[in-house]
């Protein structure tokens, strides 16, 4: 094996000498080197750079000066002594870490010798095995860690804790296998489960090393995924979580789970939104197969930068600290985003020394077959199985997570910096500041453990409500036990629940392959022949989807939806909605108000009343708290819903609310409460909205303040050809600013923004800044339809404000013609129906153009109508393309079902303006 190379190798060697590390401990040399660099690396980088800047290093090149540092400071022990003197905390960390690890290694050597015969008997090792090397796996907890041991013949795993969980799990799998055999459904497989060999020594244990192995046939691939389904059902039943890609290994046709710490998982503090409907949704997410971690759906509080699931995952981005300028005197650490790919959990063929992986999406039916078979056996034998669990699970220890371990890691990385090493109390005090409602005893124990550079660890017995730390001290008394939490769910297992979980399994695996496609086969959109009847039926179906899928809190009259979304890392997630217009309940409210005006009915009125009550209450309760004020994502948009609701239902006007929101605005305050400048979340969207109110002149001063703030924010060197996020939208805000204030400064900025956007002009269209191939888009958010809104609005405002010269007006009309041509030829064929980046948004804009700028063009009018009919026919027969499956939807106005409803109703009602896409709420 090639020897691993390290920076500052002479410092490492000197440290071995300083701590008198013996030669026979070379078997853990790499681990010790990693520990030393992990503790001292930042200090060494700081030290060599300081000496470089002080001209204390000899040599003509950075490499020569690095070698001088190694010879003069590292080899001689000067660097070691300097760390000891300047950073005593780091020295203590180093001493404790090395001593703890060497103590652990020594104990493992003794235990291996003592347990040798039993290890051979259990076939965990072969006869005549001797230890060659050891390697830490995972996190250190109080100086202890899981260790991968390599012998002269094979490998095995040492765990510094009882293996009672592993023993119980193996026994449960054996017990379940007896039911499969009795049912006669698994006799041809002989054994449904691969049981990992273990040797539990009560305070520590030995585990067989499970390595990935190839499969030999497609039948074995099907067997693997069938068994994945079986294990998924078992994990769901036992509240076994954290089954991400690192904890599942593909050993031929056998999936092996190698970490069982989170069995009988018990959520410590379910987030209380003080809102029953959101709590119901949150509980539904946590109490589903999603919580196992095996499915590619983002779980609550997950901080992975991608998909970590145990079935499909292993591809994600993460931030890593890497060495820049290695072996030079200007060496430094830099954080970079690394895209990592892991496939040990995916079955594969060996094909001419190349691995050919069997993707889960091709074996969904096998996964579901295994899940359903196991689930039905559990339901059929519920009391027998419960009796076994009560008897055999008493030895299970459940790991308790008060926080995501990534939060601890962030604090630990900061604490290791020489800059903060003497300020650790302040760093770790953040655990108290951001206490999440945790008690003092918990936080005290967290700080005590993290002070040893360990990830805090807590556990409790399955039948106990006492949460303990690593020292066995009780630090919290829960109201429930892990077994009672399990029992609550176990009692609810039934065929209906199984069918719901199966839908989640199928949806999550298939939809991760093709995001934002809806319908059983995720087919691409193709134009259909539809009718006016399709349009009316579609409106009723979409309104029913919204109303039937609302979650209502009966105790507090709250309402919400469990909506599908996409996280920043491109992972699917379920989420309850905020109050905003863009994808929240205010936006759904606007769509349902349009529907209610079209078809007044008691049920829609009831839903709208609940939405209004929610938004009004939150306005009152949170008006003084820091939050977003933008139109689409903040208070101004929520206000627009309240105003529209009061108009429809003839309630007392809330018009004073807008004045109250804006009264304290200053250009300085806008910099913090409006972090963006664009139409979506910044001043631009608010200016356009207010300027389209009938009484906009009453807000002249407020508009001027927003314009001043926007003027200070914008970057007149950046060209983003976009209405929602870029030049077109911001330029439109300044057009309205000029209309209201007649200030020539705003007109000048408009021209600069327009010219800047045209620097992104292609032969056809404008560059979509998100794309690397310099192509254009047809969407509202980043493309032609949004830019078309801007040009039409400029022409409309120019009729009274006269800010365009004749040549400029001709130019705007020419640009508008090109943008409309893009919409007609390309904007009707995108594989999404939503307002923001789909066909309904494009149709709404194209229809507004035809009615106001080309109203004699009957052919265009008919073409638009046929496209509306086509979308409706397709949606009714093949699925509404805006979510990720026919059972689960994105409900938001700009990205989901409610936006499709909004667009269709406005067509039927013949509303010939841009509506919320302006934004304008009529």
Curated annotation (Swiss-Prot):
GO terms for biological process: bacteriocin biosynthetic process; peptide modification. Keywords: Antibiotic biosynthesis, Bacteriocin biosynthesis. SUPFAM superfamilies: LanC-like (SSF158745). It comes from Lactococcus lactis subsp. lactis. This is Lacticin 481/lactococcin biosynthesis protein LcnDR2. The gene is lcnDR2. Disulfide bonds: none annotated. It holds the Pfam family DUF4135. Could be implicated in the processing or the export process of the lantibiotic lacticin 481/lactococcin DR. The keyword Iron-sulfur does not apply. InterPro entries: LANC-like, Lant_dehyd, Lanti_2_LanM.
